[in-house]
Each structure stands twice: as C-alpha cells, then as structure tokens.
Amino acid sequence: MKIIEGKLEAQGLKFGIIVSRFNEFITSRLLEGAIDALIRHGAIEKDIEIVRVPGSFEIPLIAKKLAQSGRFHAIICLGTLIRGATPHFDYIAAEVSKGIALVSLETSIPVSFGIITADTIEQAIERAGSKSGNKGWDAALVAIEMAKVMGQLK
C-alpha cells in the first residue's frame, strides 16, 4: 500500500503570499505568522514573494496570476473580513472563498486559505495570534504540506 503525505519541510520551495491591506492591524499579524512558519520550516526569505492588495476581494485575481506564473510551489492568501450591519460581508466572504478554491483547481497549484471571517473585531484578533492561534501560520503550514503532496503526485 502506498501512502502519500506531505512533510512540513519548506526547503527549496517557493511561496507567493497575498495579503490584504484592509484591516491591516490584523492582516499584518497574519503575514508575520505565515512568514514565521515558512522560515521555521526551512524556507528562505528570497523564496517568499509578498503581494499587497487593497482588500480580500482582490486576492483571487492575484492568486491566479501568481499561480499561472509557474514561479511558486504554493500560494498563501491572507485577509480579514469582519461582519458589519449589511449583507456585504456575506457576498465578499462567499466570492473570495469560491475564487481562491477555483484558482487552485484551475492551476493545480496549492492555494491556502488564510482569510479570517469573523463576526467581531475581537474574534478576528483572537485568530491572528492570541487565543485561537494564528491563521496565517496555519495557512503557511497547509501551503507547505500541499506543495509536498503535489510534488509526489507528479
């Protein structure tokens, strides 16, 4: 029986990170977490490229562009959506999620989802490095593992 698993070893892998500037007081923590996870697992800074975009809605387009470039083993998407008084949150969250998934499926490049969707600012802060860990770190680990899995399936 053959079992394929990804190891959390980022040596030799190249990563694209897309980070939203909207809610930057939170997304900056996600970015720090993602970079820390990549470096601690063997990536080097020159193999990490960061693209800043205005908001989370813009992330899927840039993810597609980076994935199609052929320069990266995985793409990490980081953003924060906080529910407001209108349905805007629901539309943006749904479209960003669909867009990120579609990029991965269309390009066969792992695209990890580090987008916080929270009802309150407090919940978002908790997911960006306090009580609930750091979703940027988590997204980076997913990117490493999936890049390794995909490498074995070629």
From Swiss-Prot:
Keywords: Riboflavin biosynthesis, Transferase. It catalyses: (2S)-2-hydroxy-3-oxobutyl phosphate + 5-amino-6-(D-ribitylamino)uracil = 6,7-dimethyl-8-(1-D-ribityl)lumazine + phosphate + 2 H2O + H(+). One of its GO terms (cellular component) is riboflavin synthase complex. (2S)-2-hydroxy-3-oxobutyl phosphate binds at A85, T86, R127. GO terms for molecular function: 6,7-dimethyl-8-ribityllumazine synthase activity. Its EC number is 2.5.1.78. GO terms for biological process: riboflavin biosynthetic process. Pathway: Cofactor biosynthesis; riboflavin biosynthesis; riboflavin from 2-hydroxy-3-oxobutyl phosphate and 5-amino-6-(D-ribitylamino)uracil: step 1/2. The active site is at H88. The keyword Transferase applies. Gene3D superfamilies: Lumazine/riboflavin synthase (3.40.50.960). Disulfide bonds: none annotated. InterPro entries: LS, LS/RS, LS/RS_sf. The keyword Transferase applies. It is an enzyme of class 2 (transferase). 5-amino-6-(D-ribitylamino)uracil binds at F22, S56, F57, E58, T80, L81, I82, F113. PANTHER family: 6,7-DIMETHYL-8-RIBITYLLUMAZINE SYNTHASE, 6,7-DIMETHYL-8-RIBITYLLUMAZINE SYNTHASE DMRL SYNTHASE LUMAZINE SYNTHASE. Belongs to the DMRL synthase family. Catalyzes the formation of 6,7-dimethyl-8-ribityllumazine by condensation of 5-amino-6-(D-ribitylamino)uracil with 3,4-dihydroxy-2-butanone 4-phosphate. This is the penultimate step in the biosynthesis of riboflavin. This is 6,7-dimethyl-8-ribityllumazine synthase. It comes from Thermodesulfovibrio yellowstonii (strain ATCC 51303 / DSM 11347 / YP87).
